[in-house]
């Protein structure tokens, strides 16, 4: 039996109501709308922790922050914790990352002169990195500008009475 492909999308600081498929009046997300129509759209997802780094660590490990202990941005993720990417790799998948996870490497597993000790912008274990955000941001923004898409003003996205309770 052929294994199914899985597309798992996470976004940093992206409000759940900022998709056109859920009725946002200014944001247009046609590709994501099609994916949501053919897949699974979690309309009541809540982050386990704040800020973003600990929240991602919880998402990637399935653990509460008090268990994985990565409680601030830049706190390394203990290498004893298995990540979703590692588990699916063991199952025969090839988890590929486009973007970032901002997961600090466990310093106990690195040599003292490792460049990964100077940043918390690492990649969670198990992923094969295809394209990092830092490599693609300007190219992507230029691609959008060529097609007439600019950056929305904060008030366009969050104003206008669109905010509503969950």
Q: Language-model segments: which ranges?
A:
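Glycine-rich, flexible loop/turn motifs
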Residues: 15-18, 23, 42, 55-56, ...
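Proline-centered helix-kink/hinge sites
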Residues: 4, 29-31, 50, 54, ...
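Catalytic-site neighborhoods of secreted/periplasmic enzymes
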Residues: 61-166
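Active-site-proximal N-terminal segment of extracellular/periplasmic enzymes that hydrolyze or transfer
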Residues: 1-49, 89-90
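A conserved catalytic-core signature of glycosyltransferases
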Residues: 30, 54-55, 72, 79
